[in-house]
């Protein structure tokens, strides 16, 4: 590694953000104490942590660095005529009321049901301008890596760690290794960030990023919008990575400017100057590197029961017989057995029962627009739920007429929430049903007991909606 002109060693963005937040250095016997800039909380993983604070007589260490919303267990149907929300069960209603009480008692800013800013936590946080370059961000949710799209070091934590951050604003963490994923070329028509990340996970495998933070680099990544970068980083955990990020640039700054929690005036100029120093230095080294050519990719879809089991929509369902490793062969056999798919058969044409467009992976305005491109002037042939990721997304989409396109196509236009991504809120599959979903996990039963999930982009999901089967969105858009 060559030194920079000032004599210092070149550093990656991960090094820079990590080093700036170490309160106590890591030793062989103890992890580092890492300061946390932003703590996002929701109604499912926070109640126990607040209970611990009460039991121990502790206050919230930094209320101004804690931000709350509701998303997992809330209904995506509107209030009834009686003014009540149609919760799926008493537990869901209790989680919401407990969240309201906890935030009131501890002075946490909450954007709950009925609030114009409420949304899925990883859509809501960036929209508020709370997520900013160079930050450390945590949340009691697996897909916190979404916020890495802004050049933040963002990762999910468990409920006990939620309590640690509430009480101390710090966490015990071991320094992660770094993995550079460089994507050359340009994505072709009909492809998006979702296709790119599914291709990356298929290449790495679901454990390929274990112990690492992924930095996404290259012209194909730079060409992505902020919505696309959030999709990319969101699924880093599905490759086993601790987090994923993209260095900030003008695209980042333009997206953040003017948002509620973003700096204003001279403070904004000072912040941007700091943020411009965050990208990895020339000559910085990574523990590992992976390279892909975006131009070689096709629209992707999963066929199995983990996000690494993905193929092009033009491809064939893999045959376990071709798998040399016995363990991998057994895993593939089990996945195909659960999914009810035939090896060697084209995935295109596979009948679909439900389509879900939404989630923290693909519930943003760009995703709504992409789905509307396919739905416009067509009719769905299967049940289709379109769920905006936040009230802001919903409002913007309705201003553009996207809700009318969705309804005229025969699809359902819902209220913001996690919805069918996690199936704990009344939106779920029945046993044996196939769903093309824009969410992030296709585990057994993820969308309901016995449900079969095929992960795809909004374009591919919408193509499945109007054809009733897995289809190449490029052909649908071309009218073929």
From Swiss-Prot:
E.C. code: 4.2.1.33
Entry superkingdom: Bacteria
Residues engaged in binding [4Fe-4S] cluster: 360, 418, 421
Cofactor(s) in the UniProt record: [4Fe-4S] cluster
Protein's GO biological process: L-leucine biosynthetic process
CDD domains documented for this protein: IPMI
Reaction catalyzed: (2R,3S)-3-isopropylmalate = (2S)-2-isopropylmalate
Cofactor note as given: Binds 1 [4Fe-4S] cluster per subunit.
Keywords tagged on the record: 4Fe-4S, Amino-acid biosynthesis, Branched-chain amino acid biosynthesis, Iron, Iron-sulfur, Leucine biosynthesis, Lyase, Metal-binding
Record-linked Pfam families: Aconitase (PF00330)
Pathway noted in the entry: Amino-acid biosynthesis; L-leucine biosynthesis; L-leucine from 3-methyl-2-oxobutanoate: step 2/4
Purpose of the protein: Catalyzes the isomerization between 2-isopropylmalate and 3-isopropylmalate, via the formation of 2-isopropylmaleate.
Name of this chain's protein: 3-isopropylmalate dehydratase large subunit
The organism's taxonomic lineage, starting at the top: Bacteria, Pseudomonadati, Myxococcota, Myxococcia, Myxococcales
Gene transcribed to yield this protein: leuC
């Amino acid at each position: 590694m060559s030194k920079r002109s000032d004599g210092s060693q070149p550093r990656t963005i991960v090094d820079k953000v990590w080093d700036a937040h170490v309160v106590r250095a890591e030793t062989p016997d103890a992890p580092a104490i890492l300061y946390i800039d932003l703590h996002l909380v929701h109604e499912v993983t926070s109640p126990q942590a607040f209970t611990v604070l009460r039991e121990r007589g502790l206050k919230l260490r930094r209320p101004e660095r804690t931000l709350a919303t509701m998303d997992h267990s809330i209904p995506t149907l509107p209030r009834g005529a009686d003014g009540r929300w149609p919760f799926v069960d008493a537990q869901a209603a209790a989680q919401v009321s407990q969240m309201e009480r906890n935030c009131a008692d501890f002075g946490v800013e909450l954007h709950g049901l009925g609030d114009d800013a409420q949304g899925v936590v990883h859509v809501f946080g960036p929209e508020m301008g709370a997520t900013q370059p160079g930050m450390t961000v945590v949340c009691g949710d697996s897909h916190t890596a979404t916020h890495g799209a802004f050049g933040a070091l963002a990762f999910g934590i468990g409920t006990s760690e939620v309590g640690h951050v509430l009480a101390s604003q710090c966490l015990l963490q071991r320094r992660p290794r770094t993995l550079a994923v460089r994507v050359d070329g340009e994505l072709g028509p009909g492809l998006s960030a979702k296709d790119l990340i599914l291709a990356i996970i298929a290449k790495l495998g679901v454990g390929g990023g274990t112990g690492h933070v992924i930095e996404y680099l290259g012209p194909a990544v730079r060409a992505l919008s902020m919505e696309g970068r959030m999709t990319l980083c969101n699924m880093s955990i599905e490759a086993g990575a601790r987090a994923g990020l993209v260095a900030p640039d003008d695209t980042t700054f333009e997206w953040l400017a003017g948002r509620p929690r973003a700096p204003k005036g001279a403070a904004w100029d000072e912040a941007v100057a700091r943020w411009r120093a965050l990208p990895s230095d020339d000559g910085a080294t990574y523990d590992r590197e992976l390279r892909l050519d975006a131009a070689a990719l096709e629209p992707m879809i999963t066929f199995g029961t983990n996000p690494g089991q993905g193929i092009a929509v033009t491809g064939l369902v893999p045959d376990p017989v071709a798998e040399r490793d016995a363990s991998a062969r057994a895993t593939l056999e089990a996945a195909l057995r659960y999914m009810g798919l035939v090896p060697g058969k084209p995935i295109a044409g596979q009948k679909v029962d439900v389509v879900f467009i939404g989630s923290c992976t693909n519930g943003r305005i760009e995703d709504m627009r992409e789905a509307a491109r396919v739905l416009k002037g067509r009719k769905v042939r299967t049940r289709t739920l379109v769920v905006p990721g936040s009230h802001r997304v919903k409002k913007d989409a309705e201003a553009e007429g996207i809700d009318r396109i969705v309804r005229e196509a025969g699809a359902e236009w819902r209220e913001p929430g996690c919805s069918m991504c996690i199936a704990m809120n009344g939106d779920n599959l029945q046993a044996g049903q196939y769903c093309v979903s824009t969410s992030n996990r296709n585990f057994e039963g993820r969308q309901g007991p016995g449900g079969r999930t095929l992960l795809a982009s909004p374009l591919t999901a919408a193509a499945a909606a109007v054809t009733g089967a897995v289809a190449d969105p490029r052909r649908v858009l071309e009218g073929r």
